[in-house]
Design a protein with these regions (language model features):
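Glycan-processing catalytic domains of CAZymes
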Residues: 8-321
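Helical coiled-coil/dimerization "stalks"
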Residues: 331-342
C-alpha cells in the first residue's frame, strides 16, 4: 500500500536548498573564497575621479584588493541614452586597477512588474509601493533589461561585464511568487547566454528569498535595511536555514544607520550568519516626502564617515576582536584616570 507524506512549503524549500547546494553547477567562484570577508560598497555615486582628493569614489577605492563588488549606476540604470559614457568607462577601469574583484552595472527590474505574463494589477501594486507613476514601471521589460545588458557589454569592452539587478523582491505578491521567481530564473539564463558564464549576476531583493530564487543569481543582496533592525532579536528570517548550504560569498548584506555603539555588533552578526559581502554605513535612509527613487535621506549619496571605514578595515583584516578589547581597555583607563583626578 502506498504511503503519502504531507510536506510543508518550508520543508520543500529546505529540500530545494539541500539539493541545489549539493549539485552546485557553477564551475568557478568568480574570484571569491568561502569564509573570506569582502567590502562590497553600494557605489551609486556618479563618477568623480576628476575631484582628486575630494573624490567620493576615491574613498571607496582606498580599500584596494579587499574590495569585492562595486556598482556602476548611470542615472538609475540608463545605459542606452549615451553610448558609451566615458566617465563610467574611466571610473570602472580605475576600480579594477585599485583591486576590485568585480565591477557590476546597475539595471532596474521593478520587481518583475513588466515581465511576461504579469497582470496589470501587479504593475499597479508595484507603482504604489515605490510611490512612482506607472510610466516609471512600464519600460522595464525582460527584453529592455537584456538590451541594456547587451549595451554595457558592447560599450565598455575594458570592463568585464557583471550585472546588478535591482528591485527583485519576490514577496510583494504572494499569489504570484512562484511565477515571479520563474521569470527571474529565465532572465538569469538569458543573461548568461547573452553575456557568458563568467558574468557575475547579482540580484537585490533587499530581503531573504525562497531557496528556489538562488537559481536566479550568483550573489544575492539578501538584507538591505538599518542596523537597529539587523540587531533586533525580534527580526526573523534575516538568513533562513535554507541558505546554510551555500558558500558565504553568495550573500551580501547592506546595513545603514550604524552607530559607534552598535557597529561592532553588526560585524559580529554578519560573521555569525556567514555573510561574505558587507557594506556598513552610518548614513541613513528615509523616504519622507520623496520616493524609493529619490528618498529624502539617501544612505548611498556619500561614503561612510571615517570612523566607519576604520572599523570596516579591522573587520576585513580580522583584527576587530582585538581592537574591541583594546578600545574597552582604553575606555577603562580613561575612567580610572577621571576618578583619580576628582
Amino acid at each position: 500500500m502506498a504511503t503519502y507524506e504531507l510536506v510543508t512549503r518550508a520543508g520543500v524549500e529546505a529540500e530545494v536548498a539541500r539539493q541545489t547546494a549539493r549539485f552546485e553547477t557553477r564551475e568557478k567562484n568568480f574570484g571569491f573564497k568561502p569564509g573570506e570577508h569582502y567590502y562590497s560598497p553600494v557605489t551609486y555615486t556618479w563618477p568623480d575621479f576628476y575631484n582628486g582628493a575630494n573624490s567620493k569614489w576615491a574613498k571607496f577605492l582606498e580599500f584596494g584588493n579587499t574590495l569585492g563588488i562595486v556598482i556602476l549606476n548611470r542615472s538609475s540604470g540608463d545605459w542606452l541614452s549615451k553610448r558609451p559614457d566615458i566617465d563610467f568607462a574611466t571610473q570602472g577601469s580605475m576600480a579594477l586597477s585599485a583591486g576590485a574583484r568585480r565591477v557590476s552595472f546597475y539595471i532596474k527590474t521593478r520587481h518583475g512588474a513588466m515581465f511576461e505574463g504579469m497582470p496589470v494589477s501587479y504593475r499597479d501594486k508595484i507603482a504604489t509601493n515605490l510611490n512612482v507613476d506607472l510610466s516609471a514601471i512600464t519600460p522595464f521589460t525582460e527584453d529592455f533589461i537584456i538590451e541594456s545588458a547587451r549595451a554595457v557589454k558592447n560599450d565598455y569592452p575594458n570592463i568585464p561585464v557583471n550585472i546588478f539587478l535591482d528591485e527583485t523582491n519576490p514577496w510583494i505578491e504572494m499569489s504570484l511568487q512562484d511565477k515571479i521567481i520563474e521569470a527571474y530564473v529565465r532572465l538569469y539564463n538569458r543573461l548568461k547566454r547573452e553575456l557568458g558564464n563568467d558574468c557575475l549576476i547579482i540580484i537585490n531583493p533587499g530581503s531573504n528569498t525562497p531557496a528556489s530564487m538562488m537559481a536566479a543569481c550568483d550573489v544575492v543582496l539578501s538584507y538591505e535595511s538599518n542596523a537597529a533592525k539587523y540587531l533586533d532579536p525580534g527580526t526573523q528570517w534575516i538568513h533562513p536555514e535554507h541558505y546554510k548550504g551555500f558558500p558565504s560569498w553568495r550573500f551580501w548584506h547592506v546595513i545603514h544607520g550604524a552607530t559607534p555603539e552598535n557597529i561592532d555588533e553588526v560585524f559580529a552578526k554578519a560573521d555569525s550568519l556567514g555573510i561574505g559581502h558587507l557594506y556598513v554605513t552610518d548614513r541613513t535612509f528615509k523616504v519622507g516626502g520623496g520616493s524609493e527613487d529619490e528618498p529624502e535621506e539617501n544612505p548611498y549619496d556619500k561614503p561612510p564617515s571615517a570612523w566607519v571605514e576604520n572599523r570596516v578595515k579591522a573587520w576585513i583584516g580580522g583584527t576587530l576582536p582585538f581592537e574591541k578589547r583594546l578600545s574597552a581597555l582604553e575606555a577603562k583607563i580613561k575612567e580610572l584616570e577621571a576618578k583619580r583626578n576628582v
